[in-house]
Every structure is written in structure tokens, then in C-alpha cells.
């Protein structure tokens, strides 16, 4: 039999398609400070641990690891308030033990609904963007009474779960999370790392995003464009009146506060890219 390329019948001679793989880099699924170890496969009463527990404050924002479609799961006494993210790569992600409290206490008075467990306004079956807020960290299900955390699982091609630790280690931590296109302003504080006539690289120690009021400590180098319209000043204390300064006067290691100009939210901006300063305050030395 002679096979003509592209004309195989009933699959004869076809090369099976390679199984879908997770993206090399995912958005880290929790915003802000976290603690976690590689506890995948660790002994548990119900069998080996199938995910990674990411410890985070109550109601910390759980974020979409990649773009995809979500499904609420509310009927598991073990998982509590849970969500599936069916990623565009073919990977399925599990978000387990989301919040079910209505107060700062462990009251268990909330339901697995948008605004309590899931992001406000999020609908079951919705398509989501990478980095979009999906829900809130909690301790529902059999995690009740324990430390608040996100039990995170990664299932390539929707199959058996694998150790998500390598993806978390290389995951992209966001500076903030907001709806695409909504206006934001950042208050970045840290020290000068490098400077040119129109850019400032800082070693950021903290960031606060407005008007979302999302603040977190950082240890991250961030490059900020400084257009000619930006105000550059020297101050004797952060928040105090300043005197005009030249950006090139900034010295490595000098303390600095940068306010970015109001801009529409994009994933690139959430990652710390395409930021433009409106005010640069250099602490006098």
C-alpha cells in the first residue's frame, strides 16, 4: 500500500498528537506574601497529598494561573468551596478550601458564592484572563479551623495531578490585580538600583495599588519610565515637601518613592512592566 501524505484512512499512518503541556510560566495563584513547601505526595489521612498548600492571609486574592474557563464546585465536604480552572493550554487547575467566612473570625456562616468564596461578580462558567481574581483564600471544608491557605493542584491535559512546585517556583508574582482596563496607580517604595536620563530601576521593598488598596512587601527590581512630564524632587522625609531635582542625581542605594501615573490595567502592568512615573521623590542623603 502506498500512503499519500495527509490521506491516511481511519487513522492508519497518523502520528498521534503530543499531549497538551502546561505553560512554562504561570501566574502565581495568590497575590501577596505567601509561604509554601513542596508537600505534594506527603502522607495525609485520606492518602498522599495531591496538591501544594499555599499559606496566605484570610481573603488573600486567588488568581487565574492562565487564561481559561472556570467552574464552581460547592458540594464537597472535604474540599469546601472549590473552583476548577480549565486553562487554555489544556491544563486543569484546582483551587480548594476557598473562604466561607463572613467575618474575620472562623464563623463558617458564608456560602460558596461570589463575593464570599469566589470573586465578586464572577459567574460559574465564565471565561477569565490570566491573573484575573477568581476568589479568596480561606479554610473551608476539612481545613476548617486550620491555617488559611489555598490548596492548589495542577493537572496537565486534565489528567492525573502532578507536583505543581516547579511551576510555583517559577511563577510570575503580580504587583496588583484588577479588572482589565480599569485605572490604577502604584506607590512603589525602595532604593535606587540604576538610572538613565529617562528611566529609573528601583529595588522595590513595597507596593500599594490604588484605588484597590492592595499593598504588599516586595524584593523585586522594577524598571519605571520617567517621562519629561514627571516631577522629580528631593525630600528630607517621605511625604514631606520637596525641592526640584534632576533624575541623574539619583544614586544607587538611595531611598526613593515612585508614584506611577494613572493607567489602564493590563497583565503586563500587573507584572511590573510598562510603568510610567508621575512623581519621583528621592530621599536626601
Write out the residue ranges for each language-model feature.
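A short hydrophobic beta-strand segment most commonly corresponding to one strand
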Residues: 149-158
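Secretory targeting and sorting signals
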Residues: 1-12
Amino acid at each position: 500500500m502506498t500512503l499519500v501524505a495527509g490521506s491516511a484512512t481511519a487513522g492508519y499512518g497518523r502520528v498521534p498528537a503530543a499531549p497538551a503541556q502546561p505553560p512554562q510560566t504561570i501566574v502565581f495563584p495568590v497575590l501577596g506574601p505567601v509561604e509554601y513547601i513542596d508537600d505534594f505526595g506527603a502522607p495525609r489521612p485520606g492518602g498522599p497529598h495531591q496538591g501544594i498548600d499555599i499559606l496566605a492571609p484570610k481573603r488573600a486574592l486567588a488568581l487565574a494561573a492562565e487564561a481559561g474557563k472556570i467552574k464552581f464546585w460547592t458540594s464537597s465536604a472535604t474540599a469546601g468551596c472549590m473552583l476548577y480552572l480549565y486553562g487554555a493550554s489544556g491544563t486543569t487547575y484546582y483551587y480548594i478550601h476557598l473562604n466561607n467566612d463572613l467575618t474575620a473570625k472562623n464563623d463558617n456562616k458564608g456560602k460558596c458564592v461570589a463575593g464570599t468564596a469566589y470573586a465578586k461578580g464572577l459567574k460559574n462558567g465564565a471565561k477569565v484572563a490570566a491573573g484575573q481574581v477568581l476568589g479568596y483564600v480561606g479554610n473551608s471544608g476539612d481545613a476548617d479551623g486550620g491555617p488559611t491557605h489555598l490548596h492548589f493542584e495542577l493537572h496537565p491535559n486534565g489528567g492525573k495531578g502532578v507536583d505543581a512546585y516547579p511551576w510555583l517556583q517559577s511563577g510570575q508574582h503580580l504587583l496588583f490585580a484588577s479588572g482589565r482596563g480599569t485605572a490604577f496607580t502604584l506607590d512603589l517604595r525602595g532604593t535606587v538600583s540604576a538610572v538613565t536620563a529617562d528611566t529609573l530601576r528601583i529595588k522595590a521593598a513595597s507596593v500599594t495599588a490604588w484605588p484597590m488598596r492592595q499593598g504588599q512587601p516586595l524584593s523585586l527590581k522594577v524598571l519605571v519610565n520617567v517621562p519629561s512630564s514627571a516631577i522629580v524632587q528631593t525630600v528630607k522625609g517621605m511625604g514631606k515637601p520637596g525641592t526640584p531635582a534632576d533624575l541623574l542625581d539619583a544614586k544607587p542605594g538611595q531611598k526613593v518613592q515612585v508614584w506611577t501615573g494613572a493607567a489602564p490595567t493590563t497583565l503586563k502592568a500587573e507584572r511590573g512592566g510598562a510603568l510610567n512615573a508621575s512623581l519621583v521623590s528621592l530621599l536626601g542623603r
